Amino acid sequence: MQKLVKIVLVFLVITSACKSVKKVQIIETQIFKKDTAQTVVISEAPKVDSAKIVKDIMTKLVKRKIDFTSFNAKINVDYETAENTQKMTAYVSLKKDSALFVKIAVSPYGVVENIYVNKDSVILIRTKGEKSIQYSAISYLQETTNIPFDFSTLQDILVGNPIFLDSNIVSYKSNSTQLLVYLVGNLFKNLVTLDNTDYKVMHSKLDDVDENRNRTCDITLSNYLPVNGNQFATYRTISVSEKSKLDISLDFKQYDFNNPLQYRFAIPTNYKPKKPVEKKPVAKKTASKK
């Protein structure tokens, strides 16, 4: 179950890896297949003030960012791999810039694990079977997944805020209904689809920059509903593949902002401490002496 919990946390934050580059042009070929990612044709757009267009895009994205003090949600989570399919319910309470409480429930057992996250640490509490508690620095998840993220990015993704605002736009293409924005960072190439009316994030496709890896991620946000004057994506799907494929869906059944935290829990003091599984260093081969 701890592996499942890490998977859910990881793919809530996977889109935070994009960094900045400096050139702005018009997309002529969209990157929808990994094997075409290196053959994108980009043509210059004469007589177009690209800097002004990009500034306008970023300004509108900032304006639609949800401002909040607290967030509660009940989320139906489905995940599927080649070997396993699992359904669970996540009960989430978030205090902005401070603390995240997550209760993981699996039928018919009820709550089987609690997760507490703050800016510095992650605590996993197993509440069924062999009860245990595991303390880790937040860097532990970064190290085990090779994906950099922080608490601020995690909370933005949970409430549905765009999380690539610190990146420069490389390319863009606009039509009557959609705006395609292309970013390239240190880890991923990211093609983001926005609604051209109110700049809701509809889709994000990430491909690994490293040609030696085959890591891809597709994220879709849909079923937007008005909440406190904001648009909130109540359904999200995530498909990730590298050596194997993982599909996750997040269906927000209940959600509210700026109310008291509903799913807080105390950190037990009598549970058996469990150490995180450390990565074993790869032994270097030494040349045999003749």
Regions found by a protein language model. Give the residues of each.
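Coil residues (strongly favoring Ser/Thr
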Residues: 35-36, 50, 98, 121, ...
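Sec-dependent signal peptide recognition
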Residues: 2-10
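C-terminal motif of bacterial Sec signal peptides marking the signal peptidase cleavage site
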Residues: 14-17
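Gly/Pro-enriched, hydrophobic low-complexity segments
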Residues: 20-28, 170-279
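Edge/loop elements at the starts and ends of beta-strands within beta-rich repeat scaffolds
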Residues: 63-71, 82-86, 93-98, 197, ...
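N-terminal leader/targeting segments and the immediate start of mature chains
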Residues: 19-76, 80-85, 275-290
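An acidic-aromatic
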Residues: 23, 99-152
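Flexible, processing/modification-adjacent segments and terminal tails
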Residues: 57, 128-189, 267-269
